From Swiss-Prot:
HAMAP family xref list: Ribosomal_bL32
Sequence similarity: Belongs to the bacterial ribosomal protein bL32 family.
Name by which UniProt lists this protein: Large ribosomal subunit protein bL32
InterPro entries assigned to the protein according to its UniProt record, in alphabetical order: Ribosomal_bL32, Ribosomal_bL32_bact, Ribosomal_zn-bd
Organism: Ruegeria sp. (strain TM1040) (Silicibacter sp.)
Amino acid sequence: MAVQQNKVSKSRRNNRRAHDALVAANPNECSNCGELRRPHHVCPSCGHYDDKEIVAQADEIDLDEDAA
């Protein structure tokens, strides 16, 4: 098991932990469909980013008909 060489003061410990905080998600509204999306990411519901369609949305596929 590892053993520390010297005691780490409360100040040094807290300074090291200063960057460990988690930041809450900050979703934005999609300019095309109005759904919430992550900043700087393609909208998962409509596939648009920066008012351009990046990902073409496929039509609904009925899996039961394809299996038969």
